[in-house]
């Protein structure tokens, strides 16, 4: 081999070595860039998953909050409705004494031949009738009728006695009428029941 060939070969070798050295850092950089890219993709996927979980959690909280608000609104409406229905309860209970007194006055035998007494009795009857119709408009209704079946939710039994013409558990005597206000008992009827 000639000197010139040797020099050329050395130049080629040197050039190859330089090229190899330049390629090595590029490969390392590519490898490092590849690792960084994979890490970045993994991190993005992890953050996306966290975001999805956070959105689901917030949607769940939103649904629960809406349901709670609906429940509160419904309870408030029911409370207002009950307040409207039963605001008159104390007043109605106080009126029951007046109704009882008027009924007792009418049940007392009176000499209706005297015109003054007859007109007084008629006035009491009209007053009672007007009072009963007025309280009925506000949801007050009487309970406790002779012959009705005894109901412990509506009636209070004072005594039980055998009575002809009545079946067992039928009301034979009403000592004091009971009353309901919009379906709720404000005073049970005091009754005697057949055995």
From Swiss-Prot:
CDD domains hit by this protein: GrpE (cd00446)
GO molecular function, one term: adenyl-nucleotide exchange factor activity
InterPro entries, sorted: GrpE, GrpE_coiled_coil, GrpE_head
Subcellular location: Cytoplasm
The keyword Secreted appears for this protein: no
Span list, region Disordered: 1-30
Function noted in UniProt: Participates actively in the response to hyperosmotic and heat shock by preventing the aggregation of stress-denatured proteins, in association with DnaK and GrpE. It is the nucleotide exchange factor for DnaK and may function as a thermosensor. Unfolded proteins bind initially to DnaJ; upon interaction with the DnaJ-bound protein, DnaK hydrolyzes its bound ATP, resulting in the formation of a stable complex. GrpE releases ADP from DnaK; ATP binding to DnaK triggers the release of the substrate protein, thus completing the reaction cycle.
Protein name in UniProt: Protein GrpE
């Amino acid at each position: 081999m000639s000197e010139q060939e040797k020099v050329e070969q050395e130049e080629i070798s040197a050039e190859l070595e330089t090229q190899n050295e330049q390629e090595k850092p590029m490969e390392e950089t590519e490898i490092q860039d590849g690792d960084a890219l994979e890490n970045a993709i993994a991190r993005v996927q992890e953050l996306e998953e966290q975001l999805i979980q956070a959105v689901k959690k917030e949607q769940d909280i939103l649904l629960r909050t809406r349901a709670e608000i609906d429940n509160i609104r419904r309870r408030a409406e029911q409370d207002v409705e009950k307040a409207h229905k039963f605001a008159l309860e104390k007043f109605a209970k106080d009126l029951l004494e007046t109704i009882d007194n008027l009924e007792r006055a009418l049940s007392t035998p009176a000499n209706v031949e005297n015109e003054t007494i007859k007109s007084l009795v008629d006035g009491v009857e009209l007053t009672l009738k007007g009072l009963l119709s007025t309280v009925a408009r506000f949801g007050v209704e009487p309970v406790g009728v002779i012959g009705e079946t005894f109901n412990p939710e509506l009636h209070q039994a004072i005594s039980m006695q055998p009575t002809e013409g009545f079946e067992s558990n039928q009301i034979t005597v009403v000592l004091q009428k009971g009353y309901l206000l919009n379906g709720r008992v404000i005073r049970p009827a005091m009754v005697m029941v057949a055995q």
